[in-house]
Amino acid sequence: LPDPLTFKDGNPVKNAPEWTRRRVEIVEDFDREMYGRVPAVTPPVKWEVTATSTETVGGVPMITKQLVGHVDNRSYPLVTVDVQLTLATPANARGPVPVIMEFGFGPRPRPANAPPLPPPPPEGTWQEQIARKGWGYAVLVPTSVQADNGAGLTRGIIGLVNKGQPRKLHDWGALRAWAWGASRALDYFETDRAVDAKRVG
């Protein structure tokens, strides 16, 4: 692997301003070789709360919202992208709360002869631990943004922006598209009074 503290011309990074310049080179390498480039223009997303329920998580009453982020597809109506997001926040919070967001891929099929899953840890699931801290949690389904296979690259957000055409060599791939979807979820959090959008992890 290239030395992160050595410029492409072979000179070492000696101080913070030089590191800022070297970081630009590293980001460019990742854009070109790993994740691809986000298009200069991407469509807006309009969020809709499709269901709201109250449930108890780790002994804490939580308000859970199911959301769909409708990606504007007027530029290419043959591809529809609806981003799936779940947001749960404490029902009795006195103000906006921090939120931990994760990617959720749903239950995976298990063979009939698979050993049973281990029980949750004594301190509870991650959602229960977060709820007991008085925080919220969110689960974004990344495959609702972009499928995790090559066949899906003419669909999802990549297919929508490319108007159904296959991606080019340096176009964004699924991981970069998922990050774009997470950023759109952050946009929604900024509009939800239950969420402290400056404290999302």
Model region roles, listed by residue range:
Residues 2-91:
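Non-catalytic accessory segments flanking enzyme active sites
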Residues 96-201:
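Cap/lid segment of the alpha/beta-hydrolase catalytic domain
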